[in-house]
Amino acid sequence: INYTSGTTSYSKGVMIPYRALWSNTQFAFDVLKMNPGDKLVSMLPMAHMYGLAFEFLYEFCVGCHIYFLTRTPSPKIIFQAFSEVKPNLVVAVPLIIEKIIKKNVLPKLETPAMKILLKVPIINDKIKATVREQMINAFGGNFYEIIVGGAAFNQEIEQFLKSIDFPYTVGYGMTECAPIICYEDWKYFKLGSCGKAAPRMEVKILSPDPENIVGEIVCKGPNVMLGYYNNPEATAEVIDKDGWLHTGDLGVMDAEGNVTIKGRSKNMLLGPSGQNIYPEEIEDKLNNMPFVSESIIIQQADSKLAALVYPDFDDAFAHGLDNDAITQAMEENRINLNTELPAYSQIARVKIYPEEFEKTPKKSIKRFLYQEVK
């Protein structure tokens, strides 16, 4: 029994059968490229299915060396561990990758001189090749690919990685599937997607036009749980009579089977005329703005949208901003963000949080704790 992360509600005990553990481990044997004696740095908690399946069970069955990171995975600690271990595969959540790139890579590319050089095609290619090599070396220089999963990946960061042909891929799964649902090798991975249905799994979108109209993602196969422990009502809500697991995630699927997630159905908000608003898409834009570490978009009692923001205080203070200046910077971000949004999803106010938002073991924000602006 493995307990869900609890991003939209409190945790439930997921009953995971042997077939699901076998299917996930066999998936890893089918598509990952590890051999006996290979190395991996384990950064994810073993109490979470993502970490248990792909940072322990698979490697244990192959005969790999697993190095457990026993400290909080800051960029400095990760770089040190990877330089010593030189892992053959990297499994991570988006937050870890995003922090490394935001802190150590993007600032160097955003200097005035570098922006000018990047406009020259030949120099641009050379700079990107150099950045790619430095990034690969930062993760030990010996891995086949980085698998990112467990939460939504920042679009700007993903576009940057794709532009330098960095060997990364984004998977999709949930505790209820122990965890894998979708995956694609980095060489064939489509930007913005989370891959295709994993071996032995079926995936479809409940939509009249799955390529263009967002619908709920449902899946079926040996990875699917038996149900929630001592909770038949909750089980019946997510597994229908035909055995399809209703994930609660919303997305589209192209003709090749690539799935793109738009957000959680429980997170979706309604605009003044019934328009669908996906807070994750707005948060993705806001998180790329100056001095923003993380954010949550919520709907207030008056139906207007508010942004809860945890600023990147270290970066702001390093640039000489005091608390009043940070507040002003967040208001400027709100104004600039609204120029990129349709009228029905404009942000009415910003509330600054002094501490990081509470998260699940896989570093997803526990959104249900922050549904009111105080």
Model regions: which residues?
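Flexible lysine-rich "adenylation lid" loop at the C-terminal edge of ANL adenylation domains
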Residues: Y310, Y353-V373
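Conserved AMP-binding A3 loop
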Residues: I1-S23
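Conserved ATP-binding/catalytic segment of the ANL
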Residues: A197, K204, E211-G271
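Conserved AMP-binding/adenylation subdomain of ANL enzymes
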Residues: W22-K39, M46-E133, N142, P167
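AMP-binding/adenylate-forming catalytic core of the ANL superfamily
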Residues: G221, L226-G227, L250-A343
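Conserved S/T- and glycine-rich ATP-binding loop of Class I adenylate-forming
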Residues: T4-T7, L40, V90, L161, ...
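Active-site loops of AMP-binding adenylate-forming
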Residues: Y18, F153, K162-F166, M174-G192, ...
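Conserved A3 ("GATE") glycine/threonine-rich loop of ANL adenylate-forming enzymes
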Residues: L95, G149-I157, V170-D185, A198-R200, ...
